[in-house]
Structure formats: C-alpha cells, structure tokens
Amino acid sequence: MFTTHPQGRSYRSSVPHHHLRQPEIQNSYDQHANNPPRQTRRRPLADMIGHPIHFLTGQFAGQTIRAELDEIQKADLGRKYARVDRRPLDPPPVVRLRYFDIREDDVDQERGTEIKNYDEIQTIGLMSTVDLFPVPNESWTSRSPTQTSFSSSSPTLSNGNENFMFSSPQTSSPTAAQSQASTPNSPSSNDIIHYVGNHAITESSKVTSSLVGATFVQPAIVDYEGKKTIIFVFSDLAVKIEGTFLLRYRVFDIYSRPRDREDLLVQAECYGGPFRVYSTKEFPGLQASTDLTKHLARWGVRLNIRETERKRRKKGEIGSPLDDPKSKRKRTSLGSEDDEASDED
C-alpha cells in the first residue's frame, strides 16, 4: 500500500496491508486526500538526452523537439601534447547535429520529422563539448553497435563562473558484455556509459582534464550531402597523455530551457570512434587532409589543410617530405598562419 513520506512524497510501504491497524490505514488515506500525488512525473534529466523535449524558452519555445548527434569524421591519431610543439588530433573530429519536430499527428512520436531548412536555425547559443575516455587497444579491433539507455547521474561541468548541470547516459551492452559486467571485478552497471566491443566505458574513467585546446566549440552551417547541415568541428584539440581514447560529444543551447526545468539541458550526445595518441618518437606522421576537411575549409571553417602526406623525419634522413613546401600545412584565408614546426626528434 501507499504511505506518505514526511516531506509529502508517497512511497510503497513494505508492511503488508493486513498488518496495519485500521486507524493507520485511515490516516494514510486521509493524508493522501489532503496531499494528492502529482499527476505528471518529471523525467530525470538524463532520460531526456536524445528524447523529445518540450521547450518553454528559446528558439523552440512551445515545440517538442528531439536532437540527434552523430560523428561524421573521427580522429585517427594525435601526438602527445608538448608546449613547444602542439599538434591537434588529426583529422579534426566533426559531429553533425540534427533536429526532429515532434507533432501530435506524427505516427512515430519518438522520432518525429527532421527539420528541413537548417538555415532558419539560430546557432547563437548552441555549443558542443567533449569528454575523453581511455580505450584498451584490443577492445576496438572489431566494434559492435550498442544501444543507449540513460542513468540519473548529473555531473556538473564548469565554464567560467557558471555551472551547467549535464546528465550522464548509461549504455546497454550486448549479452556477452552484460554477463561480463556482472562479474565481481567488473565496473558497476551504474557507472557504465558505453561499450566498445565487449569493453565497458565508465564515467569514472573519464580523463577530460588531459585534453588541451578548444573543448567547447560553436557550430557552423555548411552544405553536406546535398543539404545545409549544422556541424561542430574540433580543430584545436590535443591530448597530454599517450594511449587509445574516444570522445564523447554533447550539445546544448544556453538560451533554451525545457518545461518545468531550470537546468541547462544536454539535448543530445554521441560517442566517437577510437584514436591513438603517440609519443613524439613513435608518431608516424600525418596523412593528407581528408575530402571532408577540405570541403569544410571551402565553406569557411577554420582548419589546417595538407595537400600531401607528412611523414615523420628521422635523424640523418635527407629528402624528407617535410622539405617539400607543398607538404606544409596551411590555414584557410579565414585563419592565421599554421605552426610550421618540424616533426624532427
């Protein structure tokens, strides 16, 4: 049966109904009559990530919108950060943001209809941020798809003098991984947020403090796959430690609040593909810029462009591609000149 918490919240009593005396039963009913339960339950913040959200303020005020984030270009490698020679991840990670309008007459109330004209979206106030997680080398040789559910933990991220409440998801795993997660030495299921193969990524393993550069970026609207698209480009991101990692991307709008909420809500998130960060001596060099990187640069996104591959020059080696002026990285006309520091040991 239901009894009432001293603060007015109801909960199910563990005492069987027939063990309560009649006055206690009557008092319980009287208290419920005086303090009826709320008809609508507030969904935990974490459960709202990637799900339809009814906005009270912002550009979607009065609408129910679902946001979706996916990585369209992952980093392959990076060189361990050094103050004298800072090298960002390459190629630059890029994520795409899509919005879906949920209407009463939609057959699929969870998915909705994608917004057609992203030129009409107000990008001022939209931000994306990243977190860094380590990944064992053997766990990502064959990645398997995962499904995402969400826990109720809400870590606070600080940006200047403002604190933003963000929610952490929890990811369900394949059967084999779930059985592995139940072993005594495995991480707590409440801490698991994602799977790479059979390896569980946990919130407590986060090493975001090892990221250097722009961890919060603003969007750009470009032509991608034949239509205007909102993207976030992390072109100035380096890692201070060696190893294999992945990025978690999150997006939020500082001017939008959902109904009955005052917290800054993460609208969507996704996990990127693994990449490796090398020491200076082991760094193999950089490939020519990808077609997507060059395409984004033509749309005015500030990026480093390489026309040819740049291999690491070894000691005593002559005729390295680094000596070829065409192999030098260059910035687009909207950016400043790129650091031409050598890859020499």
From Swiss-Prot:
Q: Which InterPro entries match?
A: Velvet, Velvet_dom, Velvet_dom_sf
Which superkingdom? Eukaryota
What are the protein's UniProt keywords?
A: Nucleus, Sporulation, Transcription, Transcription regulation
Recount the UniProt induction comment for this entry.
Expression is up-regulated during fruiting body formation.
Q: Where is the composition biased (Polar residues)?
A: 1-13, 24-38
| Biased composition annotated in UniProt, kind: Acidic residues | 336-345
Biased segments, Low complexity type: 141-158, 167-184
Q: Which PROSITE patterns match?
A: VELVET
Residue segments, region Disordered: 1-43, 138-189, 310-345
One GO cellular component term: nucleus
Q: Choose any GO biological process term that the UniProt entry carries and state it.
A: sporulation resulting in formation of a cellular spore
**Domain Velvet, residue spans:** 62-306
Q: Where, if anywhere, are coiled coils annotated?
A: none
Its primary localisation, in coarse terms, equals nucleus
Q: Which cellular compartments is it found in?
A: Nucleus
Q: Tell me which Pfam families the record gives.
A: Velvet
Its family?
Belongs to the velvet family.
Question: Function, please?
Answer: Velvet-domain-containing protein that probably acts as a positive regulator of sexual development.
Q: What is this protein called?
A: Probable velvet family sexual development regulator LACBIDRAFT_317102
Tell me what organism the protein belongs to. Laccaria bicolor (strain S238N-H82 / ATCC MYA-4686)
Phylogenetic classification of the source organism: Eukaryota, Fungi, Dikarya, Basidiomycota, Agaricomycotina
